[in-house]
From Swiss-Prot:
The keyword Signal does not apply. Its main location: membrane. Belongs to the TLCD5 family. It is a multi-pass membrane protein. The lineage of its organism: Eukaryota, Metazoa, Chordata, Craniata, Vertebrata. This is TLC domain-containing protein 5. InterPro entries: TLC-dom (IPR006634), TLCD5 (IPR042512).
Length: 245
């Protein structure tokens, strides 16, 4: 069983690495980070779809069955995701592209998935955490691509930022709090699984503070720009009346 899991994770790692190499060849005029973020975007979309299917259709429901035995589909998705996180953590460390908080998030994610696979249980809530964590990931990558291509300061960029902040606050913080509560009050999950849940939620709050600061600064900047435009419009209108008279 352990050998089969290791082979699945190894195949996943090789798959993500192969996809990254393919993107690098297809985008030779772009940076390595461009190709890595394409891999991240692909994983985000794929993991959202798979984890949503597991949580909402295949089951079990994470809010009522935390700590339940892993299903075969949960195991496959966790192995697929574990291979990705190992790839991305290695890339981030090699290129030194991320700070300590993101590295801590990736490390906790890897440890949490390994823990669920080794125990053979708690895949239900780990899958739910995967869904909540990855739900905003495609938006984050879209924001980066918009900035790189010079289209960030546009209506599309504003929509992406709004959806990112709203989903992160509502799902990762709001729904995440409900999931953590269900995890803590349930007698089924192991104590160290609960501790891992607390650690992941604490990391989410660290991200949330940074996101709120960004949203506040952007809102103030947008407000001042709007005030400036209004002032210019009133001045032009006033000057026009003076010329007529």
């Amino acid at each position: 069983m352990a050998l089969a899991l290791c082979l699945q994770v190894l195949c996943s790692l090789c798959g993500w690495l192969s996809l990254y190499i393919s993107f690098c060849h297809l985008n030779k005029h772009r940076s390595y980070e461009w190709s890595c973020r394409l891999v991240t975007f692909t994983h985000g979309v794929l993991s959202i779809g798979l984890s949503a299917y597991i949580g909402f259709i295949d089951g079990p429901w994470p809010f009522t069955h935390p700590g339940s035995p892993n299903t075969p589909l949960q195991v496959h998705v966790l192995c697929l995701t574990l291979g990705y996180f190992i790839f991305d953590l290695g890339w981030c460390v090699y290129f030194q592209s991320e700070g300590a908080l993101m590295l801590a998030h990736h490390t906790l994610s890897i440890l949490g998935i390994i823990m669920a696979l080794v125990l053979g249980e708690s895949g239900t809530e780990v899958n739910a955490v995967l869904f909540g964590s990855e739900l905003t990931n495609p938006l984050l990558q879209m924001r980066w691509f918009l900035r790189e291509t010079g289209h960030y300061h546009s209506f599309t960029g504003d929509v992406v930022d709004f959806l990112f902040v709203a989903l992160f606050t509502g799902v990762r913080i709001g729904v995440g709090a409900c999931l953590l509560f269900c995890e803590m009050v349930s007698p089924t999950p192991k104590w160290f699984v609960k501790a891992g849940g607390v650690a992941m939620y604490a990391v989410s709050w660290c991200f949330m503070f940074s996101i709120w600061r960004f949203a506040w600064r952007k809102s103030i900047k947008k407000y001042h720009a709007w005030r400036s435009r209004r002032s210019e419009e009133r001045q032009l209108k006033h000057n026009g009346h003076l010329k007529i008279h």
